[in-house]
Amino acid sequence: MAIGEFGGAPAVPGDNRVLVSTPLYWLYEMSHAALNPSRAWADATRLLFRNPGNPWSYTTLGKSVAAACELFERSTRRYTRPEWRISSTLVGGERIPVRASTVWQRPFCNLVYFERLFEHPPKRLQPKLLIVAPMSGHYPTLLRGTVEAFLPNHDVYITDWIDARMVPVSEGPFDLDDYIDYLISILHKLGGETHVIAVCQPSVPVLAAVSLMEAEQDPCVPISMVLMGGPIDTRINPTAVNALAEQRGLDWFRTHVISKVPFPNPGFMRDVYPGFLQLNGFVSMNLERHIEAHKQLFLNLVRGDGDSAQKHKEFYDEYLAVMDLAAEFYLQTVDTVFVRHALPMGQMTHRGRHVDPSAIERVALFTIEGEHDDISGVGQTEAAHRLCVNIPSDRQAHWLQPDVGHYGVFNGSRFRAEIAPRISDFVLSMTLSDRAARRPRNGAKNGAKNVRVSGNGAALRSA
């Protein structure tokens, strides 16, 4: 979970329980509403200076005015939840239509299934894949490229987390324990022959959920879990994000970044970590890069470089769309993962039950890290192997991807070319191994054969 570098609201002397950031959210909503007329004026001016019937639209001055108005409108608008925009995929050289539908619902999460509408069933085995998206500020559509990479060879499901400001207070709170309950419920919905991919923040709750299910000999445990860039043990190579959590402490986050949802949102008066504060943290981590990107957008609009401008818009339409997090979930995650390091210390509990990764015996484990990850340092995800001591060595693998940062672990060209094929190979190998060994789903130990997992011809290092 990216905590960001938000400096917090000004401290209020006295009662530390006061949510001192609450006025910021209400002022943010008021300022957004106050800017509506200015946004409308800027958009009208942009259209005027883009109109082919206006002679000024062909001049550098006219193009500059239109570009400046567009930048103002984009900088002050509220970015809504993006669409999935996945209508088809290529399977065996054939273009197959894809239909996204919700197959499971709870107040804070929907499970989306990307159904491929085959005319004839594929001959190749299509393992079932559950992608657990991070609940860390951005919408799950940020993983659009991740979904697209796996659709040709897998039956893909993804957790679609709900913006907390859209959930009425009457639905009750949502914390890390609820998150784990949701994951277990989803795995029960999908059945035992499922593979789970946890992208960043969900690595801890996914590992916890599988640990609890194994301890109960649950027949619906997944065949494998893939943990990608997750903060399993943030004591290893701590990043600036990790250091911030330890330095500030839980009370600071409770009093400085938690706010109440203002009227007229459906979640009015719910305690949340607001999306706009999270975005402040995201942007501040690479401020110069974002300023330069918007400068280039202005120049591209003036030059008429539509392709470059469109790529910028598509990226920032996704990047600037953020969601609020339930305060209970955020604070419990900060405390459990970043402050107390409860999972690697053997102190994590779920509704009073001890979370013990050593209970995992049947579920294969694949961890993936990025060489230049500045959010989850190298070694933090690999630490899962030292916790899951009872998984057979031939059912474990680790991959350190060179030359990628945090987002490159689950998106981008290197992910598509080097990481996704390795995951697909691992998933397919574990599926075949599981079926060949006729692994009982009632918890009996299996006799899985040694399977060499590779991707693009490159062998994976055994953990």
Where are these regions (language model features)?
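Alpha/beta-hydrolase-fold enzymes
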Residues: 2-60, 64, 191-192, 209-328
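Short, surface-exposed "cap/lid" segments of acyl-processing enzymes
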Residues: 83-167
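Conserved acidic catalytic loop of the alpha/beta-hydrolase fold
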Residues: 166-168, 178-195, 207-211
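Gly/Ala-rich beta-loop-alpha elbow adjacent to hydrolase catalytic centers
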Residues: 198-206
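Active-site nucleophile elbow and catalytic-triad environment of alpha/beta-hydrolase enzymes
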Residues: 338-357
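Short beta-strand/loop motif that positions the catalytic acidic residue
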Residues: 360-361, 367-369, 373
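Conserved alpha/beta-hydrolase "acid-adjacent" motif
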Residues: 374-380
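Catalytic histidine-centered segment of alpha/beta-hydrolase-like enzymes
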Residues: 401-417
